Design a protein with these regions (language model features):
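Extended oligomerization regions of viral-like shell subunits
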Residues: 61-207, 231-242
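N-terminal glycine-rich phosphate/pyrophosphate-binding loop and immediately adjacent elements
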Residues: 213
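Acidic/polar, low-complexity extended loops/arms that serve as protein-protein interfaces
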Residues: 1-99
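Extended active-site and interfacial segments that coordinate phosphate-rich ligands
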Residues: 1-4, 222-228
Length: 242
């Protein structure tokens, strides 16, 4: 049978993400090795937080297209606000029927074709993880020990500060493409010229990147505000009469 698929052409425009920090030159007296490690750690953390927020919430306007954005064919793109957010799916439990239905949506492309589901990730903020996810995914085994993050379909649960309370994202990480240019951990530069008279040195880190989902069904935007606690249902069965 003739293969009917073809190459897909995607317009990619990378955006610049940068962060900076200023220090007094007198701080070099603390030790250049210590100060260098401290500044690099701060700048790398700032860069990581910026990328994380862009991957989750990015509007596509001078930033990546985030997982929560609606990118279906024909969606209205605003030149001032970018792509709109997806409509949230209310989820009150993680029973096999409910959770299987969510994963089934990921298994179908926007054009209606079937897609193999490999790795699945659930994003939640740290507070919701302990208040909502832990009660809904923790069970006690026959040995008296608790098993956490138990879901009907194997899923990696990742905490992120980029989501608001009550929100969650279920997505296929292999279907989100983050395209970064330049050095993997960003490029760090410094200058003493900006505030020369104040004896201040500025350090800057920058990274060029963009990202988007393959299509609109690679990620689901969930409302877990009313997620219920998991209860193990025990059914009593009468023993047969001998």
């Amino acid at each position: 049978k003739e293969i009917t698929s073809a190459f897909r052409v995607i317009d990619i425009t990378q955006n610049k993400l940068s962060a900076f920090v200023a220090i007094q030159l007198d701080m070099l007296d603390l030790g250049p090795v210590f100060l260098d490690a401290y500044i690099r750690r701060c700048l790398l953390e700032a860069l990581a937080c910026g990328l994380e927020d862009g991957i989750v919430n990015g509007t596509g306007l001078n930033q990546p297209i985030g997982l929560i954005r609606d990118i279906h064919d024909g969606v209205s793109y605003s030149t001032t606000t970018g792509y709109p957010a997806k409509t949230k799916i209310a989820v009150t439990d993680f029973t096999p029927k409910t959770y299987g239905g969510l994963v089934a949506q990921l298994a179908q492309t926007e054009r209606g074709n079937m897609r193999r589901v490999g790795k699945i990730v659930l994003l939640v903020n740290p507070v919701d993880y302990y208040n909502k996810i832990v009660p809904a995914t923790t069970v006690m085994g026959s040995d008296g020990l608790y098993r956490a993050d138990v879901l009907p379909v194997p899923t990696q649960i990742i905490q992120t500060t980029a989501l608001k309370s009550g929100d969650a994202v279920l997505f296929l990480p292999d279907e989100y493409k983050l395209l970064a240019g330049g050095r993997r951990s960003g490029s760090i530069e410094y200058s003493d010229e900006y505030k020369f008279l104040e004896d201040m040195r500025y350090f800057k880190i920058k990274q060029h990147a963009t990202g988007k989902c393959f299509d609109n069904t690679c990620a689901l935007y969930l409302n877990i505000a009313n997620l219920e606690e998991l209860y193990v249902t025990v059914k009593q069965v009468e023993a047969p009469t001998v």
